[in-house]
Amino acid sequence: MKISLSLIALFIAAAILFGCSTDDIPTQLTALVMQQANVTCSEISFYLDPALGGAYECETVPESSSSDIPTYYVFIYPSHTELTIQKYPLTQTQFPPQIWIYPVSRFSELLPDVLPQRVSDLRNLVTGGTWGSGELPFLPAIPQVQSFFIHETVMTFNGGIGVRFITEYSEAPTPISNKNIIYTFQGLTDDGKYWVAVTLPISSPILPAENDMLPEGYTEESLLLNYNSYVNDVIGALEAQDPDSFFPTINSLDTFEGSITVGQ
């Protein structure tokens, strides 16, 4: 399915103007029984269930901030830890199963007009259920729009707190599919030193595998013009599903997130 540049521009403009719904805010604080860690990578350790992965790759990503890099903030970040889970049960998805650990202080120095506000939004979200934009806070920064979020819940990990939700990112008004949706956790350590970002592919039995087919009853133009209505219908259908119908289950991914320890 092809989308014209003019339709993409209209989609992005509409997303900026209207954003995602903020009627439902995460108010439930969930603390999980922590499994003993069996993976350590730099300053992070956690329990990796064999059902979620059989190996991992640990990398220290060097800082990207030189003057010859475009100033757009997607290309600017501090040295940080990046862990990729291997042999994850879902493959060929938009996001790989990964964890990022960002040092907040250095990141804020590099992006003083972006990061402090994002950190403030996340803190306000987990403490009071409010934030400064239609999108829930998310790292790593990507040049796409957060199409929706569901199952948003404030959760703890060992030494920190954050928000878990299921979402999708898109650069155009494309159909929502299992190729694109992710479970994500965005949190801060209690001492404020680190931002913990987790992205894990997830799938629902009611979504198509790919996003290359128009939803029934839609044309490219009608999907753009009625995209908010389409997204709301998908949100309603997904929220009506039993959490255990997702794969991997939300509970199994929550258990994974709850086992994370940073810098201890």
Task: Write out the residue ranges for each language-model feature.
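Positively charged n-region of N-terminal signal peptides that target proteins for export
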Residues: M1-S6
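C-terminal motif of bacterial Sec signal peptides marking the signal peptidase cleavage site
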Residues: L17-G19
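Signature of long, low-cysteine stretches enriched in small and polar/charged residues
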Residues: G128-K193, T199-P208
